[in-house]
């Protein structure tokens, strides 16, 4: 196998907007998510409206559209 072809795998945290922090390993430093297993309707049994419009607005803002 060739050396130095794989990205560095290190300890990182996944942070949800609900406040849940999940330690894990990844090639990325910090990962931020909008929905995790603590607040996802499938796991909680409580349905809630997911703001899809906010995602579109963030995309447009990010790419200057």
UniProtKB/Swiss-Prot annotation:
| Any one GO molecular function term | metal ion binding
Task: Output the InterPro entries linked to this UniProt entry.
Answer: Ribosomal_bL28/bL31-like_sf, Ribosomal_bL31, Ribosomal_bL31_A, Ribosomal_bL31_sf
Q: Which PROSITE patterns match?
A: RIBOSOMAL_L31 (PS01143)
Q: Which UniProt keywords apply?
A: Metal-binding, Ribonucleoprotein, Ribosomal protein, RNA-binding, rRNA-binding, Zinc
Q: Which GO terms describe its cellular component?
A: ribonucleoprotein complex; ribosome
**The keyword Membrane belongs to this UniProt entry's keyword annotation:** no
Annotated cofactor note: Binds 1 zinc ion per subunit.
Q: List the disulfide bonds.
A: none
Cofactors, names only: Zn(2+)
Protein origin, superkingdom: Bacteria
Q: Which GO terms describe its biological process?
A: translation
- Which amino acids does the record list as binding Zn(2+)? 16, 18, 36, 39
Q: Which NCBIfam families does this UniProt record tie to the protein?
A: L31, PRK00019.1, PRK00528.1
Briefly state the protein's biological role: Binds the 23S rRNA.
Q: How does it assemble?
A: Part of the 50S ribosomal subunit.
Give the family this protein belongs to, as stated in its UniProt record: Belongs to the bacterial ribosomal protein bL31 family. Type A subfamily.
Please state what the protein is called.
Large ribosomal subunit protein bL31
Q: Which organism is it from?
A: Desulfitobacterium hafniense (strain Y51)
Q: Gene encoding it? A: rpmE
């Amino acid at each position: 196998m060739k050396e130095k072809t794989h990205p560095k795998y290190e300890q990182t945290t996944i942070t949800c907007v609900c406040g849940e922090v999940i330690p894990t390993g990844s090639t990325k430093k910090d990962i931020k998510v909008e929905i995790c297993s603590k607040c996802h309707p499938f796991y909680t049994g409580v349905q809630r409206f997911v703001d899809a419009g906010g995602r579109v607005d963030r995309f447009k803002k990010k790419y200057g559209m």
